[in-house]
């Protein structure tokens, strides 16, 4: 059989087998035919065998011949035509196996992630910076062109004595006319002027001359981490997406969508109820039926709140300024509440009540007929406490020097004035009057030295840290 006949027969067998497989799948609920199903049908199994044989022949005929199967005669003729080669050198080591181009082409390319996507360098050096500002590729280049070396006086022209060319009067500018009118000094020669300009400190730049600064001047600017305001780049609002809140963040007090929908539904229901009530009233009015009075809904409160209403919180601040002039608020017991006052520091010094010592008039002093001893005794009795009182005062001073005021204000002893009535009843002696006593400035009780007789004494006794030596 020729190649065309085998191909036609192969195509016929393949069409028959495809048709049988399709019918088998339709009869068996889409199940494909297996080996057992093919062996059970002898006709189909024979067609499979014949189809495999024909396919094998076609592939064998179309396969190319390998170069190793060439005839020896052709090889000999080719060797005769070529230039004879030198004798091969003997290799001491085992030669490596050479791979053919076909094998290299057929090798699979490893599909690792390194070859799928481009990657940068694995190690990056330090970023070049100057005063905190990252330098780019062109910032590190010198300001001038590096192709030509600059000399110090390379731009200076030769100072050759020559007749200066006459400048045209049309080229004279307004500035030159003004300077000429002001009487400027004699201009320097051109050679000297350009030569000295290389060593003169440059003048301050004017506002009109200032242009866009070059990248080399960025190094003198304020570093980025010390700037107070960083200029942000332009924001492209076209492709902005609505920011979605993170699920782990706590939501605010805003109403959710479901709550808003429920509120809208409730408003609609209330509106429909009102419309239905209005329609019902209109129908009843047309029919002549009187409307029953509406019942007011009273809240069913079993137990009222025992706490007082505090609209501004527990501190009970005044709601308005008018409330300040009102009466004080009453507590739950009916009594006015105590005004809260911030407590300060306690007393740091001892409290002393200084009572005034009234001086008797001259008329009263003229009636005093007591002896000097009795008068002194009365005055001492007024200013000096008894022995027990002195002991009590000393003991209290030893316990605490900063106790309450009650413990340090000794009760004055009530001394009855003797014989005051007898003096009034006695007749006045004629002609003789007692001279008025002059009271000293130190007669006040606070300036009188008291002779306190106690076991320890006013100074704490002889013992202790501050005791006197004997």
From Swiss-Prot:
Pfam families cross-referenced by the UniProt entry:
Drc1-Sld2
Per the record, where are the segments of Acidic residues compositional bias?
A: 320-330
Comp. bias regions, Basic and acidic residues: 418-431
GO MF terms held by the record? DNA replication origin binding; single-stranded DNA binding
According to UniProt, the name of this protein is DNA replication regulator SLD2
For this record, an example GO cellular component is: cytoplasm
Transmembrane region positions?
A: none
Q: Name one GO biological process term.
A: DNA replication initiation
The organism that produces this protein has a lineage beginning with: Eukaryota, Fungi, Dikarya, Ascomycota, Pezizomycotina
What segments bear the compositional bias annotation Polar residues? 59-70, 162-176
Is rRNA processing found in the keyword set?
no
Q: Where does the protein end up?
A: Cytoplasm; Nucleus
The UniProt family comment states:
Belongs to the SLD2 family.
What CDD domains does the annotation carry?
RecQL4_SLD2_NTD (cd22289)
Name the InterPro entries for this protein. DNA_rep_checkpnt_protein, Sld2
Keywords tagged on the record: Cell cycle, Cytoplasm, DNA replication, Nucleus
Name of the gene encoding the protein in the UniProt record? SLD2
Q: Which domain of life is it from?
A: Eukaryota
Q: Which residues form a coiled coil?
A: none
- Region (Disordered) residue spans: 52-131, 162-224, 285-437, 451-470
- Record's compositionally biased regions (Basic residues): 337-353
Q: Please explain the role this protein plays, according to its UniProt record.
A: Has a role in the initiation of DNA replication. Required at S-phase checkpoint.
């Amino acid at each position: 059989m020729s190649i065309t006949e085998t191909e036609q027969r192969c195509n016929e067998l393949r069409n028959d087998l495809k048709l049988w497989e399709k019918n088998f799948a339709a009869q068996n609920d889409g199940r494909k035919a297996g080996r057992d199903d093919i062996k059970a049908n002898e006709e189909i199994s024979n067609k499979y065998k014949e189809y495999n044989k024909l396919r094998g022949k076609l592939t064998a005929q179309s396969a190319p011949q390998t170069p190793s199967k060439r005839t020896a005669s052709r090889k000999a003729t080719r060797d005769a035509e070529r230039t004879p080669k030198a004798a091969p050198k003997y290799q001491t080591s085992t030669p490596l196996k050479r791979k053919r181009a076909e094998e290299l082409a057929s090798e699979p390319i490893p599909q690792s992630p390194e070859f799928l996507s481009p990657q940068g360098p694995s190690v990056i050096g330090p970023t070049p910076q100057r005063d905190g500002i990252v330098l780019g590729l062109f910032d590190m280049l010198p300001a001038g062109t590096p192709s030509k070396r600059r000399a110090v006086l390379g731009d200076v022209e030769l100072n050759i004595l020559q007749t200066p060319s006459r400048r045209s009067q049309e080229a004279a500018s307004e500035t030159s006319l003004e300077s000429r009118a002001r009487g400027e000094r004699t201009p320097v020669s051109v050679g000297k002027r350009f030569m000295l300009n290389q060593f003169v400190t440059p003048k301050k730049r004017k506002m009109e001359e200032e242009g866009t600064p070059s990248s080399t001047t960025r190094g003198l600017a304020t570093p980025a981490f010390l700037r107070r305001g960083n200029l942000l780049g332009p924001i492209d609002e076209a492709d902005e997406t609505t920011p979605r809140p993170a699920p782990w963040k706590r939501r605010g007090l805003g109403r959710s969508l479901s709550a808003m929908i429920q509120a809208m539904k409730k408003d609609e229901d209330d509106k429909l109820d009102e419309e239905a009530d209005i329609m019902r009233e209109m129908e009843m009015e047309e029919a002549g039926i009187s409307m029953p009075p509406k019942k007011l809904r009273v809240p069913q409160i079993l137990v009222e709140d025992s706490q007082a209403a505090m609209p501004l919180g527990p501190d009970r601040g005044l709601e308005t300024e008018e409330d300040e002039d009102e009466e004080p608020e009453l507590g739950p017991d009916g009594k006015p509440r105590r005004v809260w006052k911030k407590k300060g520091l306690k007393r740091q010094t001892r409290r002393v009540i200084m009572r005034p010592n009234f001086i008797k008039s001259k008329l009263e002093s003229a009636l005093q007929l007591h002896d000097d001893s009795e008068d002194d005794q009365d005055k001492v009795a007024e200013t000096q406490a008894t022995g027990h009182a002195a002991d009590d005062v000393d003991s209290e001073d030893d316990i605490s020097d900063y106790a309450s005021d009650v413990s340090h204000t000794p009760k004055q002893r009530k001394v009855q004035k003797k014989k005051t009535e007898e003096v009034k009843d006695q007749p006045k002696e004629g002609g003789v009057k007692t001279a008025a006593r002059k009271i000293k400035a130190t007669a006040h009780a606070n300036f009188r030295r008291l002779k306190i007789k106690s076991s320890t004494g006013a100074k704490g006794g002889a013992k202790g840290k501050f005791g006197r030596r004997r």
